[in-house]
Amino acid sequence: MSLQEEIKKRRTFAIISHPDAGKTTITEQLLYFGGEIREAGTVKGKKTGNFAKSDWMDIEKQRGISVTSSVMQFDYAGKRVNILDTPGHEDFSEDTYRTLMAVDAAVMVVDSAKGIEAQTKKLFEVVKHRNIPVFTFINKLDRDGREPLDLLQELEEVLGIASYPMNWPIGMGKSFEGLYDLHNKRLELYRGDERFASLDEGDKLFGSNPFYAQVLDDIELLAEAGNEFSEQAILDGDLTPVFFGSALTNFGVQTFLDTFLEFAPEPHGHKTTTGDVIDPLNKDFSGFVFKIQANMDPRHRDRIAFVRVVSGEFERGMAVNLPRTGKGAKLSNVTQFMAESRENVENAVAGDIIGVYDTGTYQVGDTLTVGKNKFEFEPLPTFTPEIFMKVSAKNVMKQKSFHKGIEQLVQEGAIQLYKNYQTGEYMLGAVGQLQFEVFKHRMEGEYNAEVVMAPMGKKTVRWIKPEDLDERMSSSRNILAKDRFDQPVFLFENDFALRWFADKYPDVELEEKM
């Protein structure tokens, strides 16, 4: 098979949702259909010990939440599928945002009882900004939920995206009978030995069922007043195909997967800092690091840099350029993943995700190129933390482990490090409280370094150019610090302190991140 044919087989997507909408469960079912697992771990895992296969970190298994992005790959129906299962918890949205830079489509999982929730809305805005296709799976039809028409209306009003139902539920909860499949022109039955039936058999199967009569009325209404199906509108991110189903009972999931792969896009190009777009079919290898993860295998204390292959083909042992440093690197020890399990990979093509063993060479956002190519891809989003804590080693004899742990966990990008200009104290910044809890848990469990953390409350953060800095600008209303790249930064007590500073130093430019 030619390189172009291999690339065109790739389908790389992320699954996004609010916590508890069923994202991890549907990921498990997709892996089940891909033949990667014999049984899907379920949300019952916290009690049974039968943990989700895509949740590998110890704290994820304890709490039943996803706080890191997992990468999984399988072959299905002539396609090579790359799934990125993202953190649903809001405190880890920064990791999710970066992951969304590495995919060509997104699957949005919505709880049928709750509709569009806060985190779903935030993540959708990032997806919308990138203009990548969004496929919606409305989950938990095995439970009572909201009216399907209400859910479609909410998609359009809250998210501002047109929707087109690919199937329609017949009943819900205890009255759930199956799906009216508009796309495949068939019925998918929830009970009984036969899974599918023709639409002509509907009256015989459901003739006296009031829910079936309601379905026919709804479908007639949608035909008159609903949106038209358009494959181009899907690819442009203007129309979301909507699928109903139940991930927990594995109903409607395979139909979703089949139809998703029919319409999901091939790998797309990525913009460079100069505005050029690198074509995935370009034979020269290029890629970017969108995530760094320490201790995926705690026995080996390893670090993996996750790379999205943007163009061409990776071959094991190849030499690459790292434009940020002006140096080169050799990609010898490279893996692909199924959650925590991994295997060495000899080659990969545009659209694939590979894991490069990292000894401190890479940073999130790094571009990798070959030959004379020295371009860099557009930078990944970074976020200004909102809450802060002082952190120190509980045991002074563990300083070496403490510094190693802090360095590696901060490089993952889920938490940010600052150093007080005057005192040298370490301070951590995060978007939410859970990030601190995970940091403390991992420092103790993975680096054997207990930490003491003291809350500093919320701060307003602004960066300042080194040439504008005067240490006399520091006052009781702010803390002067350095970030992990040694760039000067002020942590202001509040917005009033920021305005006071801006009035006092009108010529000093303060920069805010996303």
UniProtKB/Swiss-Prot annotation:
- Say where the protein is mainly found: cytoplasm
Alphabetical keyword list: Cytoplasm, GTP-binding, Nucleotide-binding, Protein biosynthesis
SUPFAM superfamilies xrefs: EF-G C-terminal domain-like, P-loop containing nucleoside triphosphate hydrolases, Translation proteins
InterPro entries according to UniProt: EF-G-like_DII, EFG_III/V, G_TR_CS, P-loop_NTPase, PrfC, RF3_C, RF3_dom_3_sf, RF3_GTP-bd
- GO CC annotation: cytosol
**Function as written in the Swiss-Prot or TrEMBL entry:** Increases the formation of ribosomal termination complexes and stimulates activities of RF-1 and RF-2. It binds guanine nucleotides and has strong preference for UGA stop codons. It may interact directly with the ribosome. The stimulation of RF-1 and RF-2 is significantly reduced by GTP and GDP, but not by GMP.
Family stated for the protein in its record: Belongs to the TRAFAC class translation factor GTPase superfamily. Classic translation factor GTPase family. PrfC subfamily.
Q: Which PANTHER family match?
A: PEPTIDE CHAIN RELEASE FACTOR RF3 (PTHR43556:SF2)
Official protein name in the record: Peptide chain release factor 3
